[in-house]
Amino acid sequence: MASALEQFVNSVRQLSAQGQMTQLCELINKSGELLAKNLSHLDTVLGALDVQEHSLGVLAVLFVKFSMPSVPDFETLFSQVQLFISTCNGEHIRYATDTFAGLCHQLTNALVERKQPLRGIGILKQAIDKMQMNTNQLTSIHADLCQLCLLAKCFKPALPYLDVDMMDICKENGAYDAKHFLCYYYYGGMIYTGLKNFERALYFYEQAITTPAMAVSHIMLESYKKYILVSLILLGKVQQLPKYTSQIVGRFIKPLSNAYHELAQVYSTNNPSELRNLVNKHSETFTRDNNMGLVKQCLSSLYKKNIQRLTKTFLTLSLQDMASRVQLSGPQEAEKYVLHMIEDGEIFASINQKDGMVSFHDNPEKYNNPAMLHNIDQEMLKCIELDERLKAMDQEITVNPQFVQKSMGSQEDDSGNKPSSYS
């Protein structure tokens, strides 16, 4: 081993033993060039370091190995990274969260290129758990995990990291990029869409769209298109975006989504044949955007919406009559829709198989059972917790030096502009 590398190993050992993590971070940041020049000796360096005791030193070596233009032996490197992430010291790597996250990004990109996304899911879950200060903290690795789950069509491993509400962002020593925030909510929205949890999907797309921005982001544009479609499926109309949405959405993103606005406009007429014509007209656009599946679900949701409207007019109706009123192909298709809607709790009805008549019923829920009271209690607890969090955040902002300085400055400006009451 070259003397400079020996010195690096000795310094890593010494600083780790002394617990001087800040100085150790400075060392590994300076040593990138040295490690890159001695690529053939890096496995020897890894052998001289203990993953648990010298986590930051091992991290630096693996990061450099992955940064090379071509990885000579990917399988060996993959095994080394897998072992490192599962056994490294979480307290140590939190001093170099930027490098640790960077290693995870490199691993993700390599697996995406090799079309092996499934292999990285378990590793990234461990990485997030090591890096997070708490379960409500968002890291840039969250977006990587969601991307791999989407590509592998294996959604459930991501759910524990999507079902929690994020209250904090890991700064990653200033390396956290807005792209990771947008990707987390965009990919998360796609996962929820795939699982047909449209309510949560809509929330995730909204987070991506309403992210403060000064320029158009392609991720925000794609989120906006899916937001329109999921809105129609879930609510039967496009949900209005909050007032704090950036002006670029109205100025630039909306004009780039004309086909989707036309779709929403035609959807509001409740006419399935017109909607089908519009889908055919813009089929190339919807297919190019990979949204044709969602568009078809919009058409299906319009049929359901029209069936729901019939429940407000009729007590009983034949399947044949329903099919003609809703513009379905025949009584068989009408029966299929009604059965699915009964199963999903979208309507309350029964079908008489003898005469093909559908009888509509009132909602049997009386809202007086223990389960309903438990749900109300849970919702109230969430509201209390949210109120406490808001108070804590308000207090945090109130004592923030930058906020105090700005508010004092604005008060001085106001007092300076007021005419004196004494003459």
UniProtKB/Swiss-Prot annotation:
Note the coiled coil stretches, chain numbering: none
Start and end residues of each stretch annotated as Disordered: 402-423
User: Gene3D superfamilies in the record, alphabetically?
Assistant: 1.25.40.570
Q: Name one GO cellular component term.
A: cytoplasm
Show where the PCI domain sits. Answer: 197-365
Domain of life according to the entry: Eukaryota
* Modified positions (Phosphoserine) in chain numbering: 407, 410, 423
Q: In which tissues is it expressed?
A: Widely expressed. Expressed at high level in heart and skeletal muscle.
Subcellular localization(s) per the UniProt record: Cytoplasm; Nucleus
Give all N-acetylalanine modified positions: 2
Q: Which UniProt keyword terms apply here?
A: Acetylation, Cytoplasm, Nucleus, Phosphoprotein, Signalosome
**What is a single Pfam family found in this protein's UniProt entry?**
CSN3-like_C
Assembly, in brief, is: Component of the CSN complex, composed of COPS1/GPS1, COPS2, COPS3, COPS4, COPS5, COPS6, COPS7 (COPS7A or COPS7B), COPS8 and COPS9 isoform 1. In the complex, it probably interacts directly with COPS1, COPS4, COPS8 and COPS9 isoform 1. Interacts with CK2 and PKD. Interacts with the translation initiation factor EIF3S6 and IKBKG. Interacts with ERCC6.
Recorded family membership: Belongs to the CSN3 family.
Role this protein plays: Component of the COP9 signalosome complex (CSN), a complex involved in various cellular and developmental processes. The CSN complex is an essential regulator of the ubiquitin (Ubl) conjugation pathway by mediating the deneddylation of the cullin subunits of SCF-type E3 ligase complexes, leading to decrease the Ubl ligase activity of SCF-type complexes such as SCF, CSA or DDB2. The complex is also involved in phosphorylation of p53/TP53, c-jun/JUN, IkappaBalpha/NFKBIA, ITPK1 and IRF8/ICSBP, possibly via its association with CK2 and PKD kinases.
Q: What else is known?
A: Amplified and overexpressed in some osteosarcomas (OS), suggesting that it may participate in TP53 degradation in OS.
Q: What is this protein called?
A: COP9 signalosome complex subunit 3
What is the native source organism of this protein?
Homo sapiens
